[in-house]
């Protein structure tokens, strides 16, 4: 077993060796290096064929038509294209958008930008377990609502939203429905033939493909229109200009092909490992599971350890690559906005750790993790005056702290 142990698969994944090998064939003079937009020679045709194959592989995993897949530089760009693209195109119809407070920053900050441009955004607070209350969502829908954007699986706590029902609610009212599926694609079954989802964002690097490539699913029937955010040569049916990075696209396609083949068995394996981890630490005093294990993705476990400072815990767990919050925001010392939105106090939010498991996680690593966490929590609490007071029965919330 190699240390440190990587348990941050929700931040990024290593590229699968099968994917890397495939990508190598599309870089050098000996490989297929052409520009897929070059129509006049075989270098271009071969590159275009490789892109078509990858587009099909992605569409097959999610039950879409390959013509509905638009390549972007990642899920952040896909979120931006979806939300700004719809807002700009449909603004004559209305200027109201609904999303939730626990979305990824790529959705929240895009909505904030639209607010500055005169759109109105409703941010729904989820229930205590992170799930959106559908009655609240329905109550928020108005005549001028043009877009609802709700993620499939939350990147911090792993809860799964009921996108099937939300899709029905939106479709019956003629509201466009966007789903950020970055954390769910290749992990949970997605069938866009059945789901009433109009736009869906995907990433390559969260599912053992390369970084710097993603895609946006744009429904054709009923047709969803977008205003392009990137202008140029009119690539990707005018929705996203820019020369296609063939090696990245091939890598993403291969990663999605592998995910389709291995998903069912792999998710059972990860669910077993996640449960093993939780069962190994849930009898520690003052430990709280964030999210909902029943309605949660099989690969994410977010836990708060009361009376232990999150940063010091991460230092103590230096043999584990874990995070507090998401990778995009964990550099700030602010407690996770996702956990705050669940109504959690600052102390508990500060003491949270996200364990996210993946393809190369082993049972041996999980057992090592359990032992290390138990030891570290014990040691840090021995040093903690707050823990001592708690054990003596002092109500810590009633203490008047001196302000210096």
UniProtKB/Swiss-Prot annotation:
Pathway(s) annotated for this protein in UniProt: Cofactor biosynthesis; iron-sulfur cluster biosynthesis
Entry-annotated residues carrying N6-(pyridoxal phosphate)lysine: 206
Iron-sulfur recorded as keyword: yes
A single GO cellular-component term on record: L-cysteine desulfurase complex
Pfam families, per database record: Aminotran_5
Keywords carried by this UniProt record: 2Fe-2S, Cytoplasm, Iron, Iron-sulfur, Metal-binding, Pyridoxal phosphate, Transferase
Entry annotated with the keyword Metal-binding: yes
Enzyme Commission number: 2.8.1.7
Any single biological process term in GO: [2Fe-2S] cluster assembly
InterPro entries hit by this protein: Aminotrans_V_dom, Aminotrans_V_PyrdxlP_BS, Cys_deSase_IscS, Cysteine_dSase, PyrdxlP-dep_Trfase, PyrdxlP-dep_Trfase_major, PyrdxlP-dep_Trfase_small
PROSITE patterns (UniProt xref): AA_TRANSFER_CLASS_5
Domain of life: Bacteria
Chain sites annotated for binding [2Fe-2S] cluster: 328
SUPFAM superfamilies referenced in this protein's UniProt entry, alphabetically: PLP-dependent transferases
Compartmental location: Cytoplasm
Main localisation: cytoplasm
Catalytic residues as annotated in Swiss-Prot or TrEMBL: 328 (cysteine persulfide intermediate)
UniProt: pyridoxal 5'-phosphate binding residues: 75-76, 155, 183, 203-205, 243
Swiss-Prot/TrEMBL catalytic activity: (sulfur carrier)-H + L-cysteine = (sulfur carrier)-SH + L-alanine
One MF annotation (Gene Ontology) recorded for this entry: metal ion binding
Cofactor annotation: pyridoxal 5'-phosphate
Subunit structure as annotated in this protein's UniProt entry: Homodimer. Forms a heterotetramer with IscU, interacts with other sulfur acceptors.
Biological role stated in the UniProt entry: Master enzyme that delivers sulfur to a number of partners involved in Fe-S cluster assembly, tRNA modification or cofactor biosynthesis. Catalyzes the removal of elemental sulfur atoms from cysteine to produce alanine. Functions as a sulfur delivery protein for Fe-S cluster synthesis onto IscU, an Fe-S scaffold assembly protein, as well as other S acceptor proteins.
UniProt family annotation: Belongs to the class-V pyridoxal-phosphate-dependent aminotransferase family. NifS/IscS subfamily.
Listed name of the protein: Cysteine desulfurase IscS
Protein species of origin: Pectobacterium carotovorum subsp. carotovorum (strain PC1)
């Amino acid at each position: 077993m190699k240390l440190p142990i990587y348990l941050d698969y929700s931040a990024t994944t290593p590229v699968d060796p099968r994917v890397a090998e495939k990508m190598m064939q599309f870089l050098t003079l000996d490989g297929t290096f052409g520009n897929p937009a070059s129509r006049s020679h075989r270098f271009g045709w071969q590159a275009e064929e490789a892109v078509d194959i990858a587009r099909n592989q992605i569409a097959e995993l999610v039950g879409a038509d390959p013509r509905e897949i638009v390549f972007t530089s990642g899920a952040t760009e896909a979120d931006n294209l979806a939300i700004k693209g719809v807002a700009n195109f449909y603004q004559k119809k209305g200027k109201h958008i609904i999303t939730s407070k626990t979305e990824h920053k790529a959705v929240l900050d895009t909505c904030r930008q639209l607010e500055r441009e005169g759109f109105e955004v409703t941010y729904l607070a989820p229930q205590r377990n992170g799930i959106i209350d559908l009655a609240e969502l329905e109550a928020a829908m108005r005549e001028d609502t043009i877009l609802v954007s709700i993620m499939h699986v939350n990147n911090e706590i792993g809860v799964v939203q009921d996108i099937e029902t939300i899709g029905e609610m939106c479709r019956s009212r003629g509201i466009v429905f966007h789903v950020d599926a970055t954390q769910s694609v290749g992990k949970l079954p997605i069938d866009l033939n059945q789901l009433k989802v109009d736009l869906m964002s995907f990433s390559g690097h969260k599912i053992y493909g390369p970084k710097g490539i993603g895609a946006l699913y744009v429904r054709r029937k009923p047709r969803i229109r977008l205003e392009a955010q990137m202008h140029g040569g009119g690539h990707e049916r005018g929705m996203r200009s820019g020369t296609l990075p063939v090696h990245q696209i091939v890598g993403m396609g291969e990663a999605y092909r592998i995910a389709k083949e291995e998903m069912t068995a792999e998710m059972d394996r990860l669910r077993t490992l996640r449960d093993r981890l939780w069962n190994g630490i849930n009898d520690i005093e003052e430990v709280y599971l964030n999210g909902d294990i029943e309605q949660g993705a099989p690969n994410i476990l977010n836990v708060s350890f009361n009376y232990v400072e999150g940063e010091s815990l991460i230092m103590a767990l230096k043999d584990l690559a874990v995070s507090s919050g998401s990778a995009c925001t964990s550099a700030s010392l602010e407690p996770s906005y996702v956990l705050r939105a669940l109504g959690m106090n600052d102390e508990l939010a500060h003491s949270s750790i996200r364990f996210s498991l993946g393809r190369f996680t082993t049972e041996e690593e999980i057992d090592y993790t359990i032992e290390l966490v138990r030891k570290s929590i014990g040691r840090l609490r021995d040093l903690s005056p707050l823990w001592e007071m708690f054990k003596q029965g002092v109500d810590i919330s009633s203490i008047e702290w001196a302000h210096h």
